[in-house]
Every structure is written in structure tokens, then in C-alpha cells.
UniProtKB/Swiss-Prot annotation:
The protein, known as: Ubiquitin-related modifier 1
PTM statement from Swiss-Prot or TrEMBL: C-terminal thiocarboxylation occurs in 2 steps, it is first acyl-adenylated (-COAMP) via the hesA/moeB/thiF part of UBA4, then thiocarboxylated (-COSH) via the rhodanese domain of UBA4.
CDD domains in alphabetical order: Ubl_Urm1 (cd01764)
Record keywords: Cytoplasm, Isopeptide bond, tRNA processing, Ubl conjugation pathway
Family as reported in the entry's similarity comment: Belongs to the URM1 family.
Residues recorded with modification 1-thioglycine: G107
Function: Acts as a sulfur carrier required for 2-thiolation of mcm(5)S(2)U at tRNA wobble positions of cytosolic tRNA(Lys), tRNA(Glu) and tRNA(Gln). Serves as sulfur donor in tRNA 2-thiolation reaction by being thiocarboxylated (-COSH) at its C-terminus by the MOCS3 homolog UBA4. The sulfur is then transferred to tRNA to form 2-thiolation of mcm(5)S(2)U. Prior mcm(5) tRNA modification by the elongator complex is required for 2-thiolation. Also acts as a ubiquitin-like protein (UBL) that is covalently conjugated via an isopeptide bond to lysine residues of target proteins such as AHP1.
Pathway linked to the protein: tRNA modification; 5-methoxycarbonylmethyl-2-thiouridine-tRNA biosynthesis
Covalent link Glycyl lysine isopeptide (Gly-Lys) (interchain with K-? in acceptor proteins), residues: G107
InterPro entries on file: Beta-grasp_dom_sf, Mopterin_synth/thiamin_S_b, Urm1
Localization of this protein: Cytoplasm
GO terms, biological process: protein urmylation; tRNA thio-modification; tRNA wobble uridine modification
């Protein structure tokens, strides 16, 4: 692993995977820059932007709201609620797992 990048696992569930490019894979391994263009350490907010630009192909408004996720999407960082980790400010580390699960379902 390069010192300039971070390798993380990202998983989508509860329908969020349907927003991604076919074949709508639920699990992804991503290699992203360790710092953003301003030199700040890469955090979950950066990851959300990366997903928006590189993985989501349709209806991004169902996943993102500004620089965060929409209400109703549960975010887990290493199996813990992201609210306990500082939400979007959590600095990503090699080997982290970030899971996005929609808790909203039609019926």
C-alpha cells in the first residue's frame, strides 16, 4: 500500500447498491488519496464525494444531500455508528470498512 493512498472496503445495502453502475455490486475495495487537494486527511465526507463522482450512475439525490448522506441512510464505520466516530469528519485509515444501508423502503 502506498503512503499516498488509503485502501478501504465499502459496502452498500438496503437498496443503495441499485444506485451504482451495473452490475450493482454490494462490496467494493477502493483506493483513494490519503489527502484531499487542500492537503487535509481523507475523511468520510471525501469518500461520499468520491462515491458520488465515481460509483453512482443515477439518482444521486437518493444517496447524497450536500456533502453528506441523505437522512434515512445508516452509515457504519468498522461496524459502529458513524455518529460515534464524528460522522463525515472521521479520518479514513487503511483497512477501514464503511457500510451504507438505506433504512427507507417503499411499499
Amino acid at each position: 500500500m502506498s503512503q499516498d493512498t488509503v485502501e478501504i472496503r465499502v459496502e452498500f445495502g438496503g437498496g443503495t447498491e441499485l444506485l451504482l453502475a451495473p452490475p450493482h455490486e454490494k462490496k467494493h475495495t477502493l483506493t483513494i488519496p490519503r489527502t484531499d487537494t487542500a492537503g487535509n486527511e481523507t475523511n468520510v465526507s471525501f469518500l461520499i464525494g468520491h462515491i458520488r463522482k465515481n460509483l453512482i450512475t443515477e439518482r444521486e439525490e437518493l444517496f447524497v444531500d450536500g456533502d453528506s448522506v441523505r437522512p434515512g441512510i445508516l452509515v457504519l464505520i468498522n461496524n459502529g455508528d458513524w455518529e460515534l466516530e464524528g460522522e463525515g469528519d472521521y479520518v479514513l485509515q487503511d483497512g477501514d470498512e464503511v457500510v451504507f444501508i438505506s433504512t427507507l423502503h417503499g411499499g
